[in-house]
Amino acid sequence: MKNLIILAHPDIENSLINKRFLKEAAAQNFAVRDLAREYPSGEIDGERERGIIKAHDALVLQFPLHNFSSPAILKSWIDTTMTYGFAYGRASEGMPGRAVALAVSAGIKRADYAPSGRYHFTMEQILAPFELAFRYYFHAHWRGFFAFYGAEETPGVDYQSSTEQIEKGAAEYAEFLRNLGAKSGAGKKF
C-alpha cells in the first residue's frame, strides 16, 4: 500500500511535534508532501497534486490546528485539488474508495475540547467539515483522525509538551499510521 502525507505546517522547521511525527511516517515509508515548501507562494498546482494522489492508496492530512481550523494552505489545497470529476461528480475516479485520515496537533489540553471544557466543542465536532467533505461528498474511505493535545494553560501564551508526552504521542501516531489500511472500523481516534 502506497501512503502519502499532505503536510500543511507553516513552520515545520521550528515544530517539535509535527517534525517528530514525520519521523514516524518516514519509518513506515510514507511519502510526504510539504505544501509550504512545495508552494511558498501559496498557489497550488491542482493537476500536479491530483496526479500524485492517484499514485497513492491512502492520504493523511497532517496539520496543526490554527484557530480551530486548518492552516490556509490546506484549505487552498483542498479547494484546488478536490475538483469535479476527480473528487466528486459523475464518473469521479480520484477519491472514491481511497483511504483518508487526519493527523492534527493542538496546543490546547484534551479536557478543553469537551462540552464542559473551555471551548465547549469536541475535536470530532471541530473536524466534522473534513469528514463531511472526504467521507460523504468525495466518497473516500474515511479513517478518522489522530490528535495530539498540548498542555496550554493560558490561551496563546504558555504551552508546552514534555519530551515524554511527545514520544508517547509519536508511538500512538505510529500505531495510527500502521492501522490506516485496516479493512474494518473508522480509524482509531487518540
Protein language model annotation of sequence segments:
Residues 4-6, 33, 60, 101-103, ...:
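Hydrophobic/aromatic beta-strand patches that form the interior of the parallel beta-sheet core
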Residues 16-20, 44, 72-76:
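Generic recognition of short, well-ordered alpha-helical segments
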Residues 22-23, 131-190:
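Glycine-rich phosphate/pyrophosphate-binding loop and the adjoining helix
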Residues 30-54:
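N-terminal beta-loop-helix "entrance" segment that forms/cooperates
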Residues 35-37, 65, 147:
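Active-site loop/turn elements of alpha/beta-hydrolase fold enzymes
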Residues 47-131:
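Helix-loop-strand module that forms the ligand-binding subsite of alpha/beta enzymes
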